[in-house]
């Protein structure tokens, strides 16, 4: 359709395009102009309090200061800035009286003052507030954002003294991040393009296989499920800070040129944490890249959650429509799944990002298994692709969830033993497993190689999660709160651990349809069989999550099984995959109920839709009033001791309280430390061993995870390292040595090889898909 014809036939669309064009022209004009740099002279403050100016430097001394804590010492007002991203830069010297700087290598426990920005009129538009200045540092730079259309004319920069220590501020600079102008322009362009595509599809200007009603429905469900993310702040769930820290560490690795980090070097005050070896983080590169290009950290996370909700809705819909061939039923199933109480509660109250990511791919796995087992005549590798992608998606999201996939996949294979052992199907299943391993080798190989590491998660391996089970009274919950935690053996103050009233109704509908169709020809249909297996599995997951299921007895039956199941931690986690099973069996039940009794079919849909919306609405209202919220704009806002609830990847027998300060220790007075720096996982320490006979040892504030190497920075000569006090890295320095030693984490050669195998496998899959598509087109 030509542009003139579109304008003539769709005047409202033409007006929309015109408005978008004006906004794009405005954004384009903002690309040009000089970079804003404001060099603030410390002695030109508009307000002083208990501080002095000496040689053009702002000084605050503890011995001369009698004001209290958090008192504004200097303020620079009426700073004018255009919309954009800016950095506050400060050059200073900071110290505590009586503090031994020679033994300090950084750390973040003793802030002396805060440098921040405020505005009286742009309270909502100003994002980011500044940073603290700590002992042992001399420079800091942090961003802030002005998200507005017009300029901010009353920005204030404040220096707030914390009540102890001495600080001399030499330079204060506010500088614009010019590249963010381009980020802003292309973000607006992308949003407008997305809006225009949807508008054109809905008005038949662009043809698509998707039904217009379904497109509107998927967008509506995405928006409704993402309402808590359309917020100035982040709702702080149980594990949110842990996952935000993971994202920030990936971003810092990308900035340093290290894309595949295996140790998070800045966690635990720079001692390091081994999360990447044991917790998949492929999808976290999406928010990490958004943060790297200039978005605030919490905004990057919010965008990511919206994408997860959209992906969950789209993938579950496509998986269901491929099976049932009914768009309306597929959408109902997707709607119930995305807005399920357990999913929303895990997403916003618990903040369990890995579990939520795995729920994106459960429907794809169910469809993939259905695809392979329902086809009797023609079975091709193409039919294995959904299963391969689904399992890989879960594997790159959450390892506990892949354990659930394995458990129920084995059960399904045993229930269909005759079909499973047909040579052709068995061959394709084996090929699928092989491709999954090769596709994910870059994570699997380091994970398996590190499984015997002495970390907390490998503790005693005793299965003891029966007490975390759910009571039957909780399962059909209609109203659930947006707060709480898991309380063993109690219900009060618990967050939602429920399948929800809507999905319970769905299971009942399936039971009705199953019973009524037992003696008909329908029982031989693949759709009926799928409903049976997903219905049985849904009920099993409910039973598994209950406190009455005797999980703890497995300790006396099989030690091996107990050790593996102990990784699950909470029995109610079975509800994650159970929610997917319930959604699929609900669709199967509705599919047959429509033919059996239209009243039951209609009333069931109305009841499930109403219960889902009412439940979610009540949950959102309580979430807004009863939860904690925070702005986490940049890395310094992240708690580097956010290790997850159980500190799973902390080295065993280490004391985190001893990590609050970063102390360099030597085992002899003959050994002198001349310099120290630790940036991006690379530690460099200058040492001089005045001894002539024996090795001396220097202990650096970095945890000794297997894989660290120490070598001479100039010659590459390796030094022996071992675990010292509190399992810190202890480097053996030879007699007479005078130089600089580099300590960093080095991947094994087989790990590097696996990082080549995975992209090659992905490339082969893409090429195969393109060839098959070309053949089909021809």
Please place each PLM-identified region on the residue numbering:
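Membrane-embedded transmembrane-helix bundle of lipid-linked glycan/lipid transferases
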Residues: 2-34, 175-625, 740-745, 750-778
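Extracytoplasmic
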Residues: 20-22, 47-49, 314, 607-695, ...
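Extra-cytoplasmic beta-strand recognition segments
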Residues: 42, 74-99, 172, 710
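Short beta-strands within extracellular/lumenal beta-sheet-rich domains
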Residues: 60-84, 138-145, 166-169, 673, ...
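Secreted extracellular polysaccharide-interacting domains
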Residues: 62-81, 97-101, 112, 122-128
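Active-site-proximal, structured, solvent-exposed surfaces of multi-pass membrane proteins
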Residues: 75, 140-145, 179-181, 657-778
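Extracellular carbohydrate recognition and processing domains
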Residues: 120-152
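Short beta-strand-plus-loop segments that form exposed binding edges in beta-rich domains
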Residues: 157-165, 745-747
């Amino acid at each position: 359709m030509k542009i003139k014809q579109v304008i003539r036939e769709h005047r409202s669309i033409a007006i929309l395009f015109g408005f978008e064009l004006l906004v794009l022209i405005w954004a384009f004009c903002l690309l040009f102009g000089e970079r804003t740099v404001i060099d603030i002279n410390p002695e030109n403050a508009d307000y002083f309090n208990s501080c002095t100016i000496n040689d053009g430097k702002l000084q605050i001394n503890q011995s001369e200061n009698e004001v209290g804590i958090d008192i504004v010492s200097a303020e620079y007002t009426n700073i004018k800035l255009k919309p954009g991203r800016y950095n506050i830069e400060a050059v200073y010297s900071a110290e505590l009286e009586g503090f031994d700087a020679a033994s300090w290598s950084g750390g973040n426990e003793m802030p002396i003052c805060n440098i921040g920005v405020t505005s009286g009129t742009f309270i909502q538009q100003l994002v980011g507030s500044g940073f603290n200045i700590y002992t042992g540092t001399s420079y800091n730079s942090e961003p802030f954002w002005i998200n507005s259309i017009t300029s901010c004319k009353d920005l204030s920069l404040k220096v707030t003294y914390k009540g102890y220590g001495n600080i001399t501020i030499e330079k204060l600079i506010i500088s614009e991040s010019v590249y963010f102008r381009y980020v802003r322009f292309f973000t607006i362009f992308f949003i407008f393009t997305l809006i225009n595509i949807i508008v054109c599809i809905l008005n038949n200007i662009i043809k698509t296989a998707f039904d217009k009603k379904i497109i509107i429905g998927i967008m509506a469900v995405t928006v409704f499920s993402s309402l808590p993310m359309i917020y100035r702040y982040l709702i702080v769930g149980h594990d949110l800070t842990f996952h935000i820290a993971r994202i920030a560490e990936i971003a810092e690795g990308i900035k340093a040129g290290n894309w595949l980090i295996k140790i998070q070097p800045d966690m635990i005050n720079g001692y390091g944490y081994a999360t990447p070896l044991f917790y998949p983080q492929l999808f976290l590169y999406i928010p990490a890249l958004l943060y790297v290009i200039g978005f605030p950290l919490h905004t990057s996370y919010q965008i990511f959650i919206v994408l997860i909700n959209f992906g969950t809705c789209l993938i579950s819909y496509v998986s269901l429509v491929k099976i049932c061939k009914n768009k309306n039923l597929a959408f109902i199933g997707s709607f119930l799944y995305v807005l399920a109480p357990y999913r929303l509660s895990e997403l916003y109250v618990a903040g369990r990002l890995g579990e939520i990511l795995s729920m994106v791919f459960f429907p794809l796995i169910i469809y993939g298994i259905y695809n392979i087992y329902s086809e009797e005549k023609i079975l091709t590798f193409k039919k294995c692709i959904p299963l391969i992608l689904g399992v890989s998606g879960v594997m790159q999201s959450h390892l506990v969830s892949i354990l659930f996939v394995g458990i129920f996949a084995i059960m399904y294979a045993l229930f269909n033993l005759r079909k499973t052992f047909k040579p052709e199907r068995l061959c394709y299943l084996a090929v699928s497993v092989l491709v999954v391993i090769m596709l994910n080798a870059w994570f699997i190989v380091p994970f398996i190689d590190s499984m015997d590491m002495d970390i907390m998660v490998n503790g005693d391996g005793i299965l003891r999660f029966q007490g975390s089970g759910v009571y039957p009274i909780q399962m059909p919950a209609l109203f659930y709160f947006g707060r709480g935690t898991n309380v063993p053996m109690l219900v009060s103050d618990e967050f939602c651990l429920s399948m929800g009233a809507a999905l319970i109704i769905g299971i009942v509908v399936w039971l009705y349809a199953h019973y009524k169709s037992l003696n008909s020809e329908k029982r031989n249909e693949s759709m009926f069989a799928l409903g049976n297996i997903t219905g049985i599995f849904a009920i099993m997951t409910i039973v598994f999550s209950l406190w009455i299921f005797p999980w703890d007895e497995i300790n006396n039956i099989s030690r091996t099984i107990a050790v593996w199941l102990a990784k699950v931690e909470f029995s109610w986690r079975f509800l994650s995959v159970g929610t997917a099973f319930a959604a699929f069996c609900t669709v199967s039940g509705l599919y047959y109920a429509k033919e059996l009794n239209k009243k039951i079919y209609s009333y069931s849909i109305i009841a499930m839709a109403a219960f889902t919306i009412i439940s979610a609405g009540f949950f959102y209202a309580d979430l807004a009033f009863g939860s904690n919220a925070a702005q986490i704009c940049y890395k310094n806002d992240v708690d580097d001791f956010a290790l997850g609830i159980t500190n799973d990847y902390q080295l065993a027998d280490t004391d985190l309280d001893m990590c609050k300060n970063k102390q360099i220790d030597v085992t002899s007075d003959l050994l002198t430390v001349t310099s120290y720096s630790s940036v991006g996982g690379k530690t460099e320490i200058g040492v001089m061993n005045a001894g002539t006979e024996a090795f001396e040892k220097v202990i650096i504030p970095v945890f000794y995870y297997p894989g660290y190497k120490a070598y001479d920075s100039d010659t590459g000569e390796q030094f022996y390292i071992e675990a010292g006090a509190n399992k810190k890295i202890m480097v053996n320095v030879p007699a007479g040595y005078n130089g600089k030693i580099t300590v960093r984490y080095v991947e094994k050669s087989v790990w590097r090889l696996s990082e080549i195998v995975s992209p090659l496998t992905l490339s082969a899959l893409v090429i195969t898909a393109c060839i098959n598509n070309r053949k089909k087109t021809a």
